Amino acid sequence: GVLQFSFIGYNTTEENIGGRTTINVTLNSGVINLGEVVAIGYGTQTRREITGSVANVDEASFNKGISRDASDLLRGKVAGLSITSGSADITQGSMIRLRGTSTLMNDQGPMIVIDGVPGGDMSSVAPSDIESISVLKDASSQAIYGSRAAGGVILITTKKGTGARTTVNYDGYVSMDVAANKPDMLNAAEWIAVNKELGNYETDAVQGIVNNYHADTDWFGEVLRTGFSQSHSVSLTGGSSTSNYRASYTYLDRKGVAKNNEIKRHSFRFQIQQRALNNRLRLTLDASGTLTDLSRPQGGDFIRAYNMIPLYPVYNADGTYFEGANGALYNEYDMGNPVHAMAENYDRTKQNIFTGRGEAQFDIIDGLNIKVDLFKSRSSYDQSVWNQATNYAGAGSNSNATRNNWSNDRELMEWTLNFDRTFGDHKVGALAGYSWENNEYASHYTYVENFAVTSMGADNIQTGNNLKVGNATSARNAYKLISFFGRATYSYKERYMVTATIRRDGSSKFGKNHKWGTFPSVSAAWGISQEPFMQNVKWVDDLKLRAGYGITGNQDGLSPYKSLELYESYGTYITGGSTQTAFRVSQNANPDLKWESTSMFNIGLDFSLFHGRLGGTIEYYAKKTKDMLYNYSVPTPTYVYNSIAANVGDMTNKGIELTLNWNVIKTRDFDWTTSLTLSHNENKVTRLSNDFYSTSAIYTGNPWIRGQSGQTSHIVEEGRSLGNFYNLKCLGLDADGHFIYEDVNNDKVISDDDRTYIGNALPKAEFGWTNNFTWKNWDFSFFIRGTIGNKVLNNPLAAYGTPNYIMGTNAMNNEYLTKIHESAKVSSFWIENGSFARLDNMTLGYTFDTKKIDWLSKARLYVTAQNLFVITGYKGLDPEVNYSSTSGLSPGIESREYFPKSRSFTFGVNLTF
C-alpha cells in the first residue's frame, strides 16, 4: 500500500508501506512556505502574518554565477524591482529602482539595511555571506524607516552561527569572460571602399593615410580581452547550547573584458552570540571588513577605439606606440592610440569599509524584551588618476595627476522595546524605538599638471608645477538624524490582521522651519482561507487580501548644508599691499527646505493552492511624491545667487505586479519548479512649478553627437512621464541623402521649435522567468529576463553611422553609411526599440552522495553560463542601458564610453565539512 502525507504549505509526499510499522517522513516546503520567517523593519513575521507588501528571496533562489554585489543576486527575482547596469565596468554597481523613479534629484534608489542597520552599502557584504534578502515594497511596510524610505527598503540578512557541531564551508569558482558584442566598425578594406564610393579617395587627406599606413587594426579587439575571475569563500560555524559563532573570509579577483578593468576584494565577517540567564539575555557582536582595489580604463579610451582609422597600426616599425607623425594625432579631435593610453595611464581606487556592531537583548518578562544596538562604521576612498605626457590623455598638459580622497564615519545607537503575546485567539504586538545617528564626511581633491618627474605617477604629485586655483579643494561636513518610531500589530486567528506604524524624524539636513517630519502608515489583511466557509475548500491553502497606506520621505537630494547660505573662494584682491583670497555667496539659504514626501496605497492578493504547489501574489499600487526637490533659477539681486533648491514638484507612479510560483512536476526523483515575475509601471510628472518657483520644462540629456554640442535628448514637463525623448521627428531620407524632418510648427524652417515627442525610454513592462529542475542528484536551472516597450537612443550609431567625418576617423558598418550626406542630429532616426529577452543565467550542477564519508557533509560541482544570448531588435551593443543616467531624467542613451557586456562561463564547487 501507499501512504500520502500532506500539510498546508508543504509538498505532498507518498511512501510505500512495504510491511513497515514505523515510517519517518520529511515534508519539503512548497513554492509558498506560509511559515517562512521574513525580515521586516525592526523585526520578523511569518509570511501568513504580513499585512504589507514584502518580497523575500532566500539563498536557494539567488541568481547563480558571478555576482558583483547583492543586487546581482536579486536581478529579475522581485516584481517591480528594476536592477540595471549600462556598462560592463565590473567596478561599478547597478542602478536599482523600486516601483519607478520618484524624485528629480540624486535618486539613490532603495535604502539598504544590513542585519538591522539602516544606510548600508551592498558592496560591504560578500554574496556568499547572505542568507536572505527582503524587499519592502509598499509604504505601509517602509514607513518604519521614515524620511529615507521613499525609494524602497532592501533588508539583507547575513548568515549566522548555529548551536550544532562545528562546520566548515568552502565555495569557490573560476570564470572566463568574453565580450558578448562589440561595435561593427569598418576594417581597412571597407574604409578604403567607402571613401572611394563617396568620392573621397583622391583627396589629400585620404591619400596621405593610404600611402603611409597599411595596417588592418581592429581597435576594439586591441582594447578588449578575455577576462578571468576567481572567488574563494571559507566559513566556519559552530557553537554550543548557549553560544554560537560564524566567521568567514572571501577573496574575489576579477579581470573584466576591457583592459585595465579589474577588481580585487578581501571580505571578512565575524559574528558571535552568547546567551545567559536561562536565555533571557542575548549578547551579539558583529565585525566586518571589506578591502577593495579597483582599476578602470578611462572613458576616452573607448571613444578613441571608435575614432581610430583601421589603417593605423598599434606600433611603429621600431616597436614604439603609434601616435601619428611627431604625435600629430594629439592635435586631432578625439584621436590617439587607446592601447598606448591603457599601457601608460591608470585610474586606480582603494576602497575600504569597516563595521562593528554590538547588540544586547533582554527578556524582561515573557513576551516583552528590550534591545540596544550600537554600530560604528568607517568607509574610505582613495583614487589616483595618472595621464602620461607621451599619449593623448596627458600630452596637452605635460602629464597630469589627480588624487581624490574621502572618508565617512558613521555612528548609530538604537533602543527598542518589543512586546509580542498571544491571548487565546488574539495575537498582539507592539514596538517602540529610539534612534540616534551621526555622520561625518571629509574629502580632499587635487589636480596637478606639468610634471618634471613622471616615474612615480600620481604618487609623486608634488613634482607637478601647475597647480591652478580651484584644482585643490577640501571639505568636511556632518549631519545627525534623531528618530522615534513605533508599531502595533493585531491578529485574530490569522483571519483579521492590522498593523500600524509611525516614525518621527528630526534631521539636521532640513531647513530651520522643517526640522521634523512624521511618517505614519496602516495596513490590514483578511485571511480569507481561515474563514469557516473555506475549511472544506481543500485545494486552497492560503488566500489573503491585503491593503495598506503610508507616507515615507526622501532626503537623499539634500546635502548636509543645502538649506544654508554658503560661501566659496573666488579669486584674490589686494589690500594693504598684500594679496587676500576673495569669497562670494555660492548658495542661497532656504529655511523651508524639507524632505520629499511619498504616499502610497497598495492592495494585494496572496494565494497558495494545491498543498503549496501553486502560489503567488498580484498587487496594485498608486504612489504620489510631493515636494520634490529641484534647483530653480531665481532673479538677482532679489536673491544673492541665481538658483535655489526648493520643494515644489509632484510625481505619480501607478502599477500592477504579478508573481507566480508553480511546482509543475513533483515525483520521487524529478522536480520542476517555475517562477514568473511581471510588472507594469506608469509614471507622470504632475507639477513642476508653484507661485514662487517655476519652470516651463526641464530639458536634459547629453546625446553627445559630434557637431551637436548644446543639444538635449529629453524633456521633463507637467502632465507627462519621465523618459520622454524630445527632439526632431525624422520622416526618412530624400533622394539626395538628406534627412527629412517634420516641420511641426509649419514655418518652413527646421529649428528647435520643431522638436516633439519621439519615444520613451521607460519600459511598459519588465519580466523575469526562472525554471529549476532536479533529477536525482542533478540540478539544472535557467533564468530569462527582459523589458517590453522601451526605446533607446543609439548614440554610437548617430555619431559614427554617417560619412561626414570618415576622411579623418573610422565609421560604423551600417546600411546608411553611404546614403546619408549630412551631419546627424538628435532625432527619431537614431531611436530604436529597446525591448529584449536575455538568457541571463543557466546552471547545471551535480551533488555527490556523501553519506559514506564521515568528514564530508556536502559536495556539489556546477557550471554556469551568464548572458548567453539576447533577443532584441536593437542594433547597438546592448539594449539594457542604464535607465537612470542624470538622476533618472534622461534614461535610455547608449554611451560611447560603455564597455561591451560580457558573456561568462563559470565552474564552481560547494563543499561542507
Region roles according to the model:
Residues 62, 109, 115, 227-230, ...:
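Extracellular/periplasmic, surface-exposed regions of secreted and cell-surface proteins
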Residues 200-214, 229-231, 301-340:
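Acidic, glycine-rich flexible loop segments
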Residues 760-793:
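Glycine-rich, aromatic-lined ligand/substrate-binding cores of catalytic
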Residues 5, 112, 314-315, 421, ...:
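Short aromatic-centered micro-motifs
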Residues 1-285, 290, 355, 447, ...:
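Short, small/polar-rich motifs associated with maturation and membrane association
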Residues 746, 780-839:
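C-terminal beta-barrel architecture of Gram-negative outer-membrane proteins
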Residues 169-214, 445-447, 646, 663-761, ...:
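Conserved small-residue
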